Structures are given as structure tokens and as C-alpha cells.
A protein has these predicted regions:
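N-terminal secretory signal peptides
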Residues: 23-80
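Hydrophobic alpha-helical targeting segments used for export or membrane insertion
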Residues: 10-14
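Bacterial N-terminal signal peptides that target proteins for export
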Residues: 1-8
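N-terminal signal peptide c-region/cleavage motif recognized by signal peptidases
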Residues: 17-19
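Structured domain cores in non-transmembrane regions
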Residues: 57-109
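Low-complexity intrinsically disordered segments
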Residues: 24, 87-161
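Generic structural motif
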Residues: 42-44, 57, 84-86, 133, ...
Length: 161
């Protein structure tokens, strides 16, 4: 029985440390070959009450065959984050590098779409940066959204920094 409890606790800790999963909330067709703009909702796993919506271009098989570059989608990503409930901040990374909140592949192997959270302590604001990461060549395409905490009733699980 004790092993089961320890295993359950370890699994819960592992799941809490993983980046969030996205939930598709919309898909808009943009042309006759099947290219779409996908809209997904992402709840911050360490900040309850904040939801980000990201959108990105999803290439169709026909487009990939016509234009080559079969294995990746464009780097363009848009993001909007808002308070969607009472905010409770868990054990977040307070460094200037921030913390990865979400990651998904947008190519066969190397290219990742990433959402990084940065806490702006001076302005009491959560900053969410959407960008792509590649092994060899980064992209300058990015989008940013902020959730101000100033004047809000925010519960800090480890005390306000």
C-alpha cells in the first residue's frame, strides 16, 4: 500500500512539472488546398486562473507537396493571455530566462513551438512569449502577451517574491 502511495505521489509530481497540453478550440480554413489556422487554449500549469490562446498555421499535405519543405510548418505564432479565474501562483521560475509553459513540435524532428513565462517583478506582470526554437537557426518571429497582477488578489503559494 505504501508503494502505491509513493508511486502515485511521484506520478503527480512528474505531471505537475510537465509543460501544459493544448486544447484545440478552433480551426479556420484559409484556402482551397487545406491550409488552416489553428487556435488552441493553454492553461498555465503553475499559475491557476490564467489561460493563453495561441494560433498558428497548419500546412496541408497538398501545400507540402506543391512547395517542398515537407516536414515543417511556418514559425508564425500569435498569443493572447488573460485571467480566466482567481489567480494562484505556484512555484514559478523567477529568473529573467523564464520558464517553458508549453511546447509542441512543428516539424518532423527539430523545430518546436514554445510558450515561455517570465515574471516581471518590478511591474508585477506575467509575460508570455510565443516563439519557435530550432537546433541550428532561431527565428525572429514571436508574439507576446501580458497578464498584470498589480492590484489583483493573487494567492502566492510560496509567498509573494
Amino acid at each position: 500500500m505504501r508503494r502505491l502511495a509513493l508511486s502515485a505521489a511521484a506520478a503527480a509530481a512528474l505531471l505537475a512539472s510537465l509543460p501544459a497540453a493544448a486544447e484545440e478550440v478552433g480551426r479556420v480554413g484559409v484556402d482551397w488546398v487545406g491550409n488552416d489556422i489553428v487556435v488552441e487554449a493553454i492553461s498555465d500549469p503553475k499559475v491557476e486562473g490564467v489561460t493563453c490562446h495561441v494560433s498558428y498555421f497548419d500546412r496541408s499535405v497538398i501545400d507540402r507537396l506543391q512547395k517542398g519543405n515537407w516536414f515543417e510548418d511556418p514559425s508564425n505564432t500569435a498569443i493572447a493571455c488573460n485571467q480566466t479565474g482567481p489567480i494562484s501562483v505556484g512555484d514559478i521560475d523567477l529568473s529573467a530566462d523564464g520558464e517553458e509553459v508549453f511546447k509542441q513540435g512543428v516539424s518532423l524532428i527539430w523545430k518546436k513551438q514554445v510558450v515561455t513565462r517570465i515574471y516581471d517583478r518590478k511591474h508585477e506582470t506575467l509575460v508570455y512569449l510565443a516563439h519557435t526554437r530550432q537546433v541550428q537557426e532561431g527565428s525572429a518571429k514571436m508574439s507576446m502577451s501580458t497578464v498584470p497582477l498589480y492590484g489583483q488578489e493573487v494567492a502566492w503559494k510560496n509567498g509573494k517574491p
